[in-house]
Amino acid sequence: MQRLFRHLTFAALTLTALAPAKSVAQKPAVRAVPAVPTISAHMREELGINEFTTPSIAVLLKALIALRPVPYDDVARELPAQNPADRARLALSTGAVIADGFLAIVAEKQSRIEPVARALVRQAKGLGVGEHVTRHSRSILEKAVVKNWAGIQKELIGTQRDVEGGMMALRDEEIAHLVSLGGWWRGLEISSGILSKQYSEQGATLMAQPVVIDYFADRISTMHPNFQKTKLWAGLNNKLTEVRKLAVKPDKALPTVEEVRAIHAIAKAMNDLIATPEE
């Protein structure tokens, strides 16, 4: 189960590959993307690519399936109608939309696939990797019509492969991490929401993952100083600490149902902050 949740970080969730860091504020909203490069094992190591920033979608889907039956209406949300104005929120929001897509697939909600696909294309274009998503999006829509869930999963895996190359071409480490983190926060909101409704000790093990939490805390601590002055960064940093206190205990006890509900409230508040423009 621990291995499943390590992939449930959604974290890079399809749109992450790392390269030398640049400031979130310094990146333009859209850039032309060259052809998808091949990522060798050596390049992955050099760029810091690992199981948190590029999880297998196939394993991720298995992790969500382990939480079935999914009370979809209780954990679903309205997708953002437009892209956030700032690039950091756009990256976080993109990861969250991917998590929404995984939820729709596991719940087999045909009507939710098209909104997810279109939102993902719009946001990927804003990040400068739209060319790597559009082709897969069309195929996802076609397969959704006939409820070809296995085919949709295959296209999502292809999306991960292509967008990984696109993000690497953009040479933007911070944005890659934020896409990953946005997916993790939305994934945490979904999983804790499910466990709040149908608690089990096995499911509670999904919350107690100090390695994952510490990984993201370390990543945001190294981001550009200007970003660290924002309310968004403070929220990311503080709420990771809050989740860790509830989920990870010295005696290794699992979170109680009350603590899972508290984690859900924290995750929801974080996602609300992501959706709120910086003042």
Regions found by a protein language model. Give the residues of each.
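Bacterial N-terminal signal peptides that target proteins for export
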Residues: 1-9
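Bacterial N-terminal signal peptides
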Residues: 9-17
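Signal peptide processing junction and immediate N-terminal pro/mature segment
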Residues: 19-28
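N-terminal Sec/ER secretory leader and immediately downstream segment
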Residues: 27-140
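Secondary-structure edge/capping motif, primarily at the C-terminal ends of alpha-helices
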Residues: 101-108, 127, 131, 166-170, ...
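Short, charged, amphipathic alpha-helical segments
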Residues: 114-118, 138-139, 178-181, 203-208, ...
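Extended amphipathic alpha-helical interaction segments
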Residues: 143-226
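A cross-kingdom marker for long, charged
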Residues: 224-279
